[in-house]
Amino acid sequence: MDGGAGSMWEQVFADLAPGFVPDDGALDRAAADLGFPLPASYRAFCRTCGVGLAGGQFRIAVPAPFEACDLVTQAGLIAHSVGAAVAMLEEGAEPHRFDVEGGEASVVERACFFGAGEDGSFLFWDVSGTDGEYDVWLLAPDLETVRFGGESLDDFFTRVAAPSAALVLGPGAEPLPARFEGIAEATLARTEQAQP
């Protein structure tokens, strides 16, 4: 484990039990498949935390040989699912529109989805960043509300585990626990084998 990356995530998650951790080769292949460099905070997350449940709420996709948690697979699946749901919403009486915090709707056009919340929300990067990081955004379960989550993945989890959680997760939301519960490779393999 990289001392700097590990200590960063150990500060974010006071209770950290790592799951399956991808190697650098898997991270590089995922970046090549997606067509952009993976943010430094995300790479550190993958190498320190791996597959699991963050804050009791979010599953962050990581490069893995298991479709249910693989970054490239999930990025495409979530984008397709959100697109299909938005298309259904557009068939209603009023046209669908994203209500983006700050008013810059173009962040949705540059979205790469990389995480899902237990409440039906989705996390995505605005891949226009140039400093080695991408802003993290949250698409609420209503598939309309888009809130700024943080300037990096560690910033996002720091914000949602603090009183500022309601600014990201929505009015009335309580701070999430500073906990990461990893899922072991053996468990992921059994789950993959059990699927039809």
Feature map (PLM): residue ranges:
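A surface-exposed partner-binding patch
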Residues: 1-119, 187-196
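Compact, glycine/acidic-enriched structural inserts
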Residues: 146-167
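Intrinsically disordered, low-complexity regulatory segments enriched in Ser/Thr/Pro
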Residues: 132-141
